[in-house]
Each structure stands twice: as C-alpha cells, then as structure tokens.
Design a protein with these regions (language model features):
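Conserved, well-structured core domains of diverse proteins
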Residues: 1-57, 559, 566, 576-577, ...
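Charged (often Lys/Glu-rich) extended helix/loop segments that serve as interaction or gating elements
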Residues: 4, 305, 313-315, 319-645
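Short, glycine-/Ser/Thr-/acidic-enriched flexible segments
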Residues: 30, 38, 67, 101-103, ...
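A non-catalytic, amphipathic alpha-helix used as a structural packing/dimerization or gating element
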Residues: 66-74, 226, 263, 313
Length: 645
C-alpha cells in the first residue's frame, strides 16, 4: 500500500480551497498560517507548544491581525482594479459593521488602516455608536449609523458630526426621520441623512430573508415617497446624500447581487432626476466567505464569485447607469464585515478521549448454546456479500429489534444483548464499507454511515465558541493540526463538554464521502491531539453564550515581525468566578458559605482539619481558574487505541 503523504491530507481536508492564501500543511505534517503575502509561515504546533510554556491553556482563540490588514488591502486593490477598468471617477469606501466582531483589538486593527484604505465603521445600536465614537478615527473616516434609533442615539450622532466626525444617520423607519428632523432643527445642525431602501430583490443562502419585500428594515417605495415629502417640508432635501440597501449576509449567488444593483441604481437615477444630491450609494454587506472551499452557491456555505467579481459588478453598475443617463458617478460604500474578519481567527482545542460502537471479531467465540438470534447475526456477519447486502441488512436489523424486545421482557440476559450489539454494529460497518463502493446507494444504506463514526470528546463549548454551528448549521472548516503526514484511520464526530446532546459538530466539509464525519487519527497517551476550527472571526465570539457556564476562551494575538512570529498579547479567558458573577453568584459570599460548612463538618468530626483546609484551598483555586478542563501532569483522559476500519 502506498505511504500516506501530506498531499493526501491537503486533498482530504480541501485546505487549498477554503484556506487559499492563508492556510496550508508543511512537510512535517503540521498546519501552518501565512498571515502576510510572501511572509513566513507559522507552524501551529510550535506556536501551541510555546503557549503551553506560557501557561496558556486550551481551548484558545488564535488571532492574526496581519490577516485583517491583508483582507483590507485585498478588497482595496480590487476597487482600484475595477475603477481603472471601468473608468470610475468617484471614491470607494470600506465600512466595517462592528456587530460582526466588536472586540476592541479587532476594530482597532481595522481602523488603523482608515487613512490608507478609506476604512470606516458602522454602528447598529447605541452601545456600538458609543464604542465607535471612542476610537481614534481619521477625521475623514466614514461612520454609518444604522439600526433602530431613539432621541439620545440621534442626538449623540449629531453632536459628533458637529465636532467634525463624518457621520451619516441612515433612516430605517419613518419615525426616525421625524425625530431626526426635529432634533436637527432644535440643535441647529444640518445632518448627513441616508435612507435605507427596502428592495424587492433578496439575497441567497441562510440570510436570504434579510432582504426583499418582507425584510425587517428599510423604507418601501411608498414610504420613501412619504420621506421625500417630509424632507421637503422640513427643508432638509440638501441633507439627503446617501441611499443604502442590504439584501442579507453571506450572499451565495452573484446573480442576486447583480439584480439588487440594477434595482438600486434605478432608485439613484430617479432620486437624482427629482433634484436630490445623492452622493453615496451604500450597497451594504453580503460579500461572502468560501467556508467549504467549493466556490458554489449550491451548498449554502460558499459563494460562486470572487471579491474582484463582486467589486466589478458594483462599480460597473454605477458607471453604466450614470453613462446611460448622463449623471454624476456616486461614491460607493460596501459594509463588508464577514469577508474582512472571518479568516483571521482559529479556534483550537484538544480531543480528550473517544468512544466507539462495539465490535465483533474472530477472537470472540459463539457457544453452541448461544441464543438463536446471536447465531443468526453471526451467520449474517460471516457470510455477508455485496449481491445480497440489502436483504442481509434487513435481516440484521430485524434480529437486533427482536433481541431488544426480548431483553425488555426479561427473556434475554445481558451477555446475550452485548453479543447482539457487537455483531450488529460489525455487520453495519461491513455493510457500509461494501455500500460505499456502489454508485447508486439506496437511502437506507446511506444513513448507516451517520451512525458509525467514533465520538471524540473535545475541550470546548460549541455554544460559546461556534454558536452558528448549532443555531443555523453553519459549516466551518475543521481539521487536525498535526500528524497530517499520517493517514487518518478513524472517522469521528466532535462532542463538546457541555451537558447538552446538541453540543457536537457532526456536519463537515463534504469531501471524499465525509460529510457527516471527520477523518482523524487514533489518540495516543500523553500526546495532545489538536483540532482547529477555521474562519471563525466573524460573529462567533460575540454571539457565543454561556451554556453550562463555560465562558470566553483564552485569546492570543500573533503578528509577523522581522520575518518571524511574535506573541503580541494574551487575553485570559473568563474564570469560574467571573461567569458566576453574570448569574448573580458573588464569589466572596460563596467562599464564606463554604468556610462555614467546612468548619461545621470539622467540628462534627466528619472530616479532619487537614481535609477541610485542602477542600477550601481546592475550592478557591477552582473558583479563580479557567472554566474549561485543564491538564494535570500533562495528561487528559486520552487512550491509545486503533480505529475499526
């Protein structure tokens, strides 16, 4: 048999497609990150070993700020190329909606390039506006105010505009426009007004309903006419400078974007002809990420276009409509959050232990007085052939069902049930192996493969670190980070450490028949098995919840300097005391309660004073420790084992 090569792992995990430009596998079989174009590679195994020396426990979120810079530069370069090709004379702006990832280091890294790349920020709520205004933005950096707004929100934005910030208040509802007009008059400020238009066009993919006639935000055509009347009545027509639309996040199909652009450019033409000085067209978000590497709109986890095509279509739509109608070209704004931030973060955790379904082998003997159902199943297992595979599978299922019924009636003992289970699941494995070679697989045989993978129990919380995986079945690239020069002989689903059966990853990038399982290696005693989840920089951190009180993970910022990597910052994850404080458990009162209980137990002779002191010490240490499982003597619970093929 040919020896497994790194190139085989590259193909198996599809890393060259979803990880293009940033992630690959080196000759040692370790995943490497290349944050800078033509820059040095960072071996993730070496990085994790160094973090261990710094007492940084897993799970950990690895952030690479240089990738953020690269994403901005890439989008900006696409704008430059399109502007040159289509003779676009106006300005283009990249506006980052901070809802995608509000972590201050992420936002600060993006705005540090504001002057060079026309990077601005979008706030969709009062808290987000407060955050944006506190940052050291360039005076010409665009600030877009979206979302529902009350008087205090609008007043804050107007005063910030008066002090020199380039702020646009985008009206989502008629009520907001009335409030804005009243406040602007009272404060004697000429506002920069934008209006979000509710297009008939909608996006595609998981967030399709964010656009279209029934979408949550924006003014339809009738409401827009009402808004125009109010602007004239309040003498604010010259303040109306921006139109905005958003057809949904992660738009998978470029044709939906083209359709929306056609629609919005007609709004631009109509408004200009009515005498409104529209200077900006904000096409919102939607620029997607190729999560599964397929470059297809079919899966729902990828996109069928490139950044360049997206930008080309946007700029061409504006240039073409203006040329045909002899109108000035408006400035273009894109609110790209997912595409900017997704690639820069990797979640890393360890597999703790694993379980697998029982198996039968020739070393197990079947006694002559064994139950008839056991003998029947053994006969099926011993004589299974491809030409009778469906019939024999039906027989096996019937035998198992009969055995379970008899066990429930007390007519079959535990030893017999255990043998039945071993035989049945061994038959299932053999049936699956034979069936996988068939071109036309019956649906009932397809379902077998979903039951067979091992369960790898991993030190993370799906609900805290990958909420979209649970909530909307978002698929992220997942793969082992080491031993990729070895053949992965196991398949597994990944189970988190919450007490919830939903806490698992059982959908993966569909390559080589592994849609419902991940190819992995057998665990080895004393050797950590690292697993990485990639492209998690958008939404996951801020949407995560504290199911079972698992808090934020440790986070590490890694940059490239002087042709090598540097650990810039280690942000400690939440302690048990900190997460308990969220649910109103005061850690000082808790310790006092424990001390009272221990003292009573010592006085009653239930425990010794030494045991009491040890208990209090352990309680305190745990209270101020990590919410996730921590290594003891460099060992978790893993065991060396081979996988059933």
């Amino acid at each position: 048999m040919r020896k497994w090569k790194v190139d085989d792992s590259v193909e198996l995990y599809n890393i060259n497609n979803w990880g293009k430009d940033y992630f690959s596998i080196n000759t040692s079989g370790n995943v490497v990150v290349t944050p800078k174009v033509n820059g040095p590679e960072i071996d993730l195994k070496q990085l994790l070993q160094e973090l261990q020396l710094h007492d940084v426990s897993l799970p950990v979120l690895l952030r690479f700020p240089d990738i953020l810079h690269n994403r901005i530069a890439k989008i900006s370069k696409c704008f430059e190329h399109a502007a040159k090709e289509y003779e676009y004379q106006a300005q283009s702006y990249i506006v980052y909606p901070i809802k995608v990832n509000q972590m201050r280091p992420v936002v600060e890294e993006l705005v540090s390039h504001s002057n060079q790349y026309n990077v601005g920020l979008e706030a969709g709520s009062k808290p987000e506006l407060h955050a944006v205004l506190s940052l050291n933005l360039d005076s010409q950096s665009m600030i877009i105010c979206n979302g529902y707004k009350d008087e205090s929100y609008i007043e804050l934005a107007l005063l910030a505009q008066k002090m020199g910030r380039k702020i646009f208040i985008v009206v989502e509802k008629m009520m907001e426009l009335r409030t804005l007009a009243n406040l602007a008059k009272r404060m004697n400020i000429r506002p920069n007004i934008g209006i979000r238009i509710k297009l008939a066009s909608s996006g595609s993919g998981k967030w399709e309903e964010s656009g279209g006639d029934v979408s949550k935000f924006g003014l339809n055509s009738s409401e827009l006419m009402e808004a125009l009347s109010l602007l004239e009545q309040e003498q604010l027509t010259d303040s109306f400078k921006l139109i905005h639309f958003h057809i949904g996040s992660q738009v998978t199909n470029i044709r939906r974007i083209k359709t929306a652009l056609k629609e919005v450019t007609q709004f631009y033409v109509q408004l200009i002809k009515k005498g409104y000085n529209i200077q900006f067209v904000d096409i919102g978000g939607g620029l997607g990420v190729n999560y599964d590497g397929t470059n297809s709109s079919v899966t729902g986890n990828s996109i069928n276009y490139s950044i360049q095509e997206y930008v080309n279509d946007a700029i061409y739509a504006l240039v073409d409509i203006c040329r045909k109608n002899q109108l000035p070209q408006p400035n273009l704004i894109i609110e790209s959050g997912r595409s900017l931030t997704a690639h820069h973060s990797i979640l890393v955790f360890e597999a703790l232990t694993s379980t697998q379904l029982p198996a039968f082998n020739d070393e197990i003997s079947i006694d002559e007085d064994a139950h008839e159902l056991v003998k029947d199943l053994y006969e099926i297992w011993d004589n299974l052939t491809p030409n009778r595979i469906i019939e024999m599978w039906h027989d096996a299922m019937q035998a198992r069902e009969d055995a379970l019924d008899l066990f429930n009636l007390g007519l079959v003992d535990l030893e017999t049930r255990a043998l039945v289970e071993r035989l049945f699941w061994s038959i299932a494995r053999d049936v699956n192996a034979m069936a996988s070679k068939s071109k036309h697989l019956p649906e009932e045989l397809k379902r077998i493969s979903r039951s067979l993978p091992d369960k790898y129990f991993c030190n993370f919380s799906l609900f805290q670190s990958l909420p979209d995986s649970w909530a909307i079945d978002q698929i992220f690239p997942v793969m082992p980070l080491t031993r990729l020069n070895e053949k992965p002989t196991c398949t597994a689903t990944l189970q988190d450490i919450t007490c919830d059966s939903d806490g698992k990853i059982d959908h993966f990038i569909s390559t080589a028949n592994h849609e419902y399982n991940l190819p992995v290696h057998p665990l080895k005693d004393g050797e950590p098995y690292y697993i990485g989840v990639f492209l998690v920089g958008a939404y996951q951190e801020i949407l995560g919840d504290m199911h079972n009180l698992f808090g934020d993970t440790n986070a590490v910022h890694v940059s490239i300097k002087n042709n090598s990597y540097v650990i810039d910052r280690v942000i400690e994850g939440e302690t048990i005391a900190e997460v308990l404080d969220y649910v109103q458990f005061d850690h000082k009162r808790m310790v006092r309660a424990i001390e009272v209980w221990v003292n009573q137990s010592v006085k009653q002779g239930i425990i010794t004073p030494e045991e009491g002191r040890e208990f209090i010490s352990n309680y305190r240490a745990g209270l101020y420790g990590y919410t996730y499982l921590e290594r003891t003597d460099n060992v978790f619970f893993s065991q060396t084992k081979e996988c059933d093929s």
